[in-house]
């Protein structure tokens, strides 16, 4: 019996040594798969009459209101998607996560500004005054203190923004209403100079009536995401290669330059390969984007030349007939 016990013990000991030797020969870990490469997707745009065409989103949310992401992620998304500037515009009145992240309305901006500086993204300080219609939701951009907008009376909140030199934008005028209307309060705000711009595109909606108001009232045009989710979860980039954005014709790539351009109404709206704006600006973008070669071959009836799009804006030819000033009847 003793002999059997010794043999069994010896066998177990030998097996343990073999297993230890085999384990020592194995690598500690084997990596399978790779992390997604985080690269910036540039959108080439032309310079126009000395103005830089900057790519901006002036309406995004974070966990500091009813968004689901941290402010730094908004900056990282903007960098990857080729933007130059974003405005974090968390709701003043609606902060479901307030008990977890704190009550200060300046927190999101303060948290994101270092990441923005590191990635060369212009970060605009703002907040969304969120009331039922009328007046609806209004973004106050370029404010110094977002906490000052936390007022029970919405007119006091808008006045507080105006006193800080803010640019005030009416958000998604057609969202959540039976009919889109320019109310008396909007006329009052407009006459006071407290309503400076309007979203004609928001998330997945564009508002033709709002475009008419912008032309009639000479308001600045905006197209923004109003993103609460992760951008890549919100938009199917198989349908489009860019998020909705506001293109700003700025004198320079600075926050002050953008602010000046907004008050001067030098903006275009770009969404789903559609470029929207005032005719004179659209014409300038079109002309600055195209390079036309000299005529390189001629016949009695035809002239041959090349037209090159030097930007990443897609242009579709609706009519391939070109007319020259000296031969308007030639085709």
Each predicted region: which residue ranges?
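Bacterial N-terminal signal peptides that target proteins for export
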Residues: 1-7
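Hydrophobic h-region of N-terminal signal peptides that target proteins for export
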Residues: 11-19
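A metal-dependent hydrolase metal-coordination microenvironment
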Residues: 33-165, 171, 180, 193, ...
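Structural recognition of alpha->loop->beta junctions
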Residues: 185-205, 245-250, 255-256
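Short acidic/histidine-rich active-site segments
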Residues: 219-235
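Catalytic cores of secreted or luminal carbohydrate-active enzymes
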Residues: 238-286
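Surface beta-strand/loop "capping" patches
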Residues: 269-310
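Conserved small/polar residues in nucleotide/adenosyl-binding loops
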Residues: 323-330
């Amino acid at each position: 019996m003793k002999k059997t016990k010794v043999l069994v013990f010896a066998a177990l000991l030998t097996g343990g040594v073999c297993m230890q030797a085999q384990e020592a020969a194995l690598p500690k870990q084997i990596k399978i798969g790779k992390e997604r490469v985080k690269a910036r997707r540039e959108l080439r745009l032309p310079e126009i009459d000395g103005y830089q065409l900057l790519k901006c989103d002036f309406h995004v949310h974070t966990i500091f209101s009813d968004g689901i992401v941290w402010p730094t992620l908004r900056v990282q998304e903007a960098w990857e998607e080729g933007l130059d500037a974003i405005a974090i515009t968390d709701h003043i009145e609606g902060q479901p996560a307030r008990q977890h992240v704190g009550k200060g309305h300046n927190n999101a901006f303060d948290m994101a500004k270092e990441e923005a500086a590191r990635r060369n993204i212009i970060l605009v300080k703002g907040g969304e005054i969120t009331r039922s219609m009328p007046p609806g939701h209004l973004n106050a951009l370029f404010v110094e203190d977002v906490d000052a907008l936390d007022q029970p009376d919405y007119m006091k909140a808008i006045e507080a923004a105006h006193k800080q030199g803010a640019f005030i934008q009416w958000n998604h005028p057609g969202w959540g209403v039976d009919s889109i209307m320019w109310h008396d309060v909007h006329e009052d705000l407009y006459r006071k100079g407290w309503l400076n711009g309007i979203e004609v595109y928001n998330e997945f909606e564009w508002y033709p009536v709002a475009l008419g108001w912008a032309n009639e009232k000479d308001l600045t045009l905006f197209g923004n995401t109003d993103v609460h989710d992760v951008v890549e979860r919100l938009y199917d980039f198989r349908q489009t290669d860019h998020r909705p954005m506001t293109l700003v014709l700025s004198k320079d790539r600075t926050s002050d330059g953008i602010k000046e351009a907004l008050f001067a109404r030098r903006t275009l709206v770009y969404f789903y390969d559609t470029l929207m704006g005032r005719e004179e600006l659209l014409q300038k973008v079109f002309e600055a984007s195209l390079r036309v070669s000299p005529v390189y071959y001629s016949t009695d009836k035809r002239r041959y030349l090349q037209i090159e799009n030097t930007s990443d804006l897609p242009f579709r030819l609706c009519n391939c007939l070109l007319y020259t000033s000296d031969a308007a009847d030639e085709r």
